[in-house]
Design a protein with these regions (language model features):
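C-terminal helical cap/extension that packs against the catalytic core
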Residues: 194, 198-203, 210-215, 299-300, ...
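Extended acidic/charged loop-beta regions that coordinate divalent cations
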Residues: 122-171, 202-243
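A conserved segment at the C-terminal end of the G1
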Residues: 49, 57-74
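Charged, amphipathic alpha-helical linker segments immediately N-terminal to NTP-binding catalytic cores
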Residues: 1-21
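Beta-strand->loop->alpha-helix junctions that form or flank phosphate-binding loops
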Residues: 195-197, 209-227, 247-251, 273-284, ...
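Nucleotide phosphate-binding/pyrophosphate-handling subdomain across enzymes
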Residues: 133-142, 149-160, 164-168, 175-178, ...
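ATP-dependent carboxylate-amine ligase catalytic core
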Residues: 7, 21-23, 27, 31-35, ...
């Protein structure tokens, strides 16, 4: 098969068709291909970020702070919202198609008959691509779990675990302790581990101790607390005072900030920001798809919350901005998510539900969501075929409502961002 003239989309479509297991946790395949490529990780600071929720926010905070200090920073996150290129950035700019294509060609030249999943291809390509840039630091987001995730072929300078909650039980275990054990698999011997997961700090700390690793736990070794003139971040040896926390943040974002700052101290304390530069950063800090607000006739509030823990945090942020009046929600979930728990967090502030089937085989159907909503006594529900139909429908009735909430998955928030941007 001649792939010399393939565009990026051709490569991605082909990768999806090769291995039908979208999730197939194992390090054997990526390690074998990594060895065949002769890949050697760069001698720079590498931050590896795992957790149930808050990984993306923590990565963005770390990236913003390190770039502010003048470092050249590469990041790898997943999934993307609009374009695949978002997954890999260098100094805040997504890489060009050619960067990925060159890396995919390099992988194919050595892969042989070793099967790779879509995510494994992307991870190897991300590392190859970033290695071509003069990076001072990499910030890498774990995809799923940790121990067997493709990103775990790296040996990080600091391992970060943001929080632990129930999600992806089919692959990671049915209890928070089982999930914590999987995520703690990223802890590297003799490299510090920073943990923002207070509920499983003991078990993660035990694993860190067995690996002869310095362990920093939120609440014990570092914290973000209220002070006289703002918030105060403190560790055993450093303090940053007068921090102005954004008024729409919830506890999750505050914990992510505390964890990011401790991670920087654990890696290189000289890179910690002062309060003035940190406040300037926070005043301008935003992440696509995380409490992202568009003003299109009425406010559209978008959040990729896709499990109960994330939904609780999203609800807290809505309360922080004192959301009131009649609100409408565009909503869909994957089949493995706890729909009833998710819905219970929003039903008292939602006057109308608009549901649809997302463009992925893992999506619940709109009809199934509607059926389960009616079983909970929620009957003002409109079912539409796909996200775009839902957005167009909302456009015709939004004058009756105070705000539009869009949530449940990257697969509905991403298309909504694209749709709203096209309306500008």
């Amino acid at each position: 098969m001649n792939r010399s003239n393939w565009a990026l989309d051709d490569w991605l479509n082909w990768q999806e068709s090769l291995n039908q297991n979208q999730i197939d946790l194992s390090l054997d395949r990526v390690k074998e291909v990594k060895k065949k490529m002769g890949f050697i990780q760069p001698d720079i600071d590498i931050y590896l970020v795992a957790g149930t929720n808050g990984k993306g926010t923590t990565v963005h905070l770390l990236n913003s702070i390190l770039c502010l200090k003048g470092l050249n920073v590469g990041t790898y996150t997943s999934p993307h919202l609009k374009k695949y290129n978002e997954r890999v950035t260098y100094n805040n700019k997504p890489l060009e198609d050619t960067n990925f294509i060159d890396s995919f060609i390099e992988i194919e030249n050595v892969r042989g008959d070793v099967p790779l999943t879509y995510f494994e291809y992307g991870t190897l390509a991300a590392f190859l691509s970033l290695n071509r840039f003069p990076c001072d630091a990499w910030i890498i987001e774990v995809g799923l779990g940790g121990r067997l995730d493709a990103t775990n072929i790296l040996n990080p300078n600091v391992s970060i675990i943001t929080n632990i909650a129930l999600d992806h039980q089919e692959w990671l275990g049915n209890t928070v302790n089982e999930i914590a054990t999987e995520k703690a698999g990223i802890i590297s011997s003799n490299a510090p581990c920073v943990c923002g997961a207070l509920n499983t700090g003991e078990i993660i700390g035990e694993i860190a101790n067995k690996k002869n690793t310095d362990f920093y736990l939120i609440g014990d070794d570092f914290s973000l607390s209220n002070g006289v003139n703002g918030s105060v971040w403190s560790s055993k040896s450093k303090t940053i005072e007068k921090i102005k926390i954004p008024n729409h943040w919830a506890q999750g974002e505050e914990n992510n900030l505390a964890t990011a700052l401790m991670s920087i101290e654990a890696c290189n304390a000289d890179l910690l920001p002062n309060s003035e530069s940190l406040n300037h950063l926070l005043d301008n800090f935003s992440i696509p798809g995380r409490f992202q607000v568009f003003d299109y006739r009425i406010p559209w509030i978008l959040d990729v919350a896709h499990n109960p823990n994330a939904a609780i945090n999203f609800r807290e942020r809505l309360e922080a901005i004192k959301l009131h009046g009649k609100n409408i929600i565009i909503f869909s979930l994957m089949k493995d998510k706890n729909l009833e728990k998710f819905v219970s967090l929003f039903e008292d502030i939602i006057a109308k539900w608009v549901v649809c089937t997302m463009d992925t085989p893992r999506s619940l159907s709109g009809d199934e969501i509607s059926k389960r909503l009616s079983e909970k006594g929620l009957f003002d529900v409109t079912v539409l075929n796909d996200p775009d139909e839902a957005f167009e429908y909302i456009e015709t009735i939004n004058h009756n409502y105070n705000a539009v909430i869009v949530t449940g998955s990257f697969e509905i928030v991403g298309p909504c961002i694209q749709w709203l941007e096209n309306k500008k």
